Each structure stands twice: as C-alpha cells, then as structure tokens.
C-alpha cells in the first residue's frame, strides 16, 4: 500500500487492505524526522489518490483518509469521512465540525478519492467531484509541509467506531 507504512488490524487484499476493526488503520509517515524519512519533493504540492470500497454503513461519522500537514499545535489536517446516511464529509483545518457534507457513496461500489495540496490550497475530491477546498495557513512565509497520511483509525477519532472499508491502488503524485 505505502512505503514504510504501519498497518494495524487490517486484512491484506490485492493491491491494498481491508479495514474492519474499530482500530484498523494504515499510517504512512512521509516527512517525520523520527523515521529518517524525508520526502522533500512532497512538501507543498501533492495529490494522493486511492480506490475505496465501503462495505457497509457505519453507525456514525467514520474517518476514511486523513492527511496531517506539519507537526504543529494544533495539528492541521485534511480529512475525508463517510457517514451513516451515505454522505461524504470533509473536515479541513483542525475543525470539529464538517467543512462540507455532500455527495453520496454507495455500499460495495468502488469510489476514487483524492486529496490535493498545491501551495497553500487544499482540495478534496471524490469520483472527480470537488467536495471542499480551502486555504491552509502559512508558517512564516511558506506553506505547511506534509507530515503523514492515515487511512482508517488514526488514534484521534472515536476508537469504538468500526470501519468497513477496503483501500486499494494508493498513488501519491508530486504536483
């Protein structure tokens, strides 16, 4: 799925993983000094694309994909969630309320999700449709740097919320 990723409570499937437990997740450190992994080319301009299939509706809002930008307090994130009423939800910044809630997902149908960061502009797409975008803050005069990606449970969401999603064909592009 991803170079140097940590997989927790997930089942390997062709070209990816199936997440089925409350704490199932895949954490991919991209620019974390502790891991001695610095992908400088990914700092301010990237596109992450993945195929996802939601097997069944969750009982609440469930994280699908999170990008953590910079190791700052508070942490700045870009999130895609899926809801019990088959909606997509985005949360940009470190907000507790959704930035947008729109579009619908279908159980057992493959969807294409994308997170983009171009300079200080963050965008979220599902199946080619823009779900949300915003300006991300600058640190000094430069944009925040990409820190890590996470699919599923990332330790900051409700650990009792089960995830029933398959993530495959993850691609990361330098823009």
Curated annotation (Swiss-Prot):
Keyword tags: Glycosidase, Hydrolase, Repeat
Keyword Transmembrane helix: no
GO molecular function: exo-alpha-sialidase activity
Pfam families xrefs: TS_C (PF22925)
EC number: 3.2.1.18
Catalytic activity: Hydrolysis of alpha-(2->3)-, alpha-(2->6)-, alpha-(2->8)- glycosidic linkages of terminal sialic acid residues in oligosaccharides, glycoproteins, glycolipids, colominic acid and synthetic substrates
Record carries keyword Hydrolase: yes
Domain of life from the UniProt record: Eukaryota
Further remark: The parasite mammalian stage surface antigen exhibits extensive antigenic diversity.
Function per UniProt: Developmentally regulated neuraminidase implicated in parasite invasion of cells. May contribute to the pathology during T.cruzi infection by cleaving sialic acid from cells of the immune system.
UniProt record similarity statement: Belongs to the glycosyl hydrolase 33 family.
Protein name per Swiss-Prot or TrEMBL: Sialidase 85-1.3
Protein source organism: Trypanosoma cruzi
């Amino acid at each position: 799925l991803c170079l140097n990723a940590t997989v927790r409570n997930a089942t390997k499937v062709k070209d990816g993983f199936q997440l089925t437990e409350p704490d199932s997740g895949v954490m991919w450190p991209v620019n974390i000094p502790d891991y001695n992994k610095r992908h400088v080319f990914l700092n301010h301009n990237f596109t992450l694309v993945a195929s996802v299939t939601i097997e069944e509706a969750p009982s609440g809002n469930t994280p699908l994909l999170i990008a953590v930008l910079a190791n700052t307090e508070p942490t700045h994130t870009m999130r895609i969630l899926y809801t019990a009423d088959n909606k997509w939800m985005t949360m940009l910044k470190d907000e507790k309320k959704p930035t947008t809630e729109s579009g619908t997902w279908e159980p057992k149908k493959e969807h294409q999700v994308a997170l983009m960061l171009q300079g200080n502009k963050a965008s979220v797409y599902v199946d080619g449709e823009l779900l949300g975008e915003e300006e991300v803050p600058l640190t000094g005069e430069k944009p925040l740097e990409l820190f890590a990606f996470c699919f599923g449970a990332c330790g900051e969401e409700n650990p009792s919320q089960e995830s029933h999603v398959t993530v495959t064909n993850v691609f990361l592009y330098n823009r």
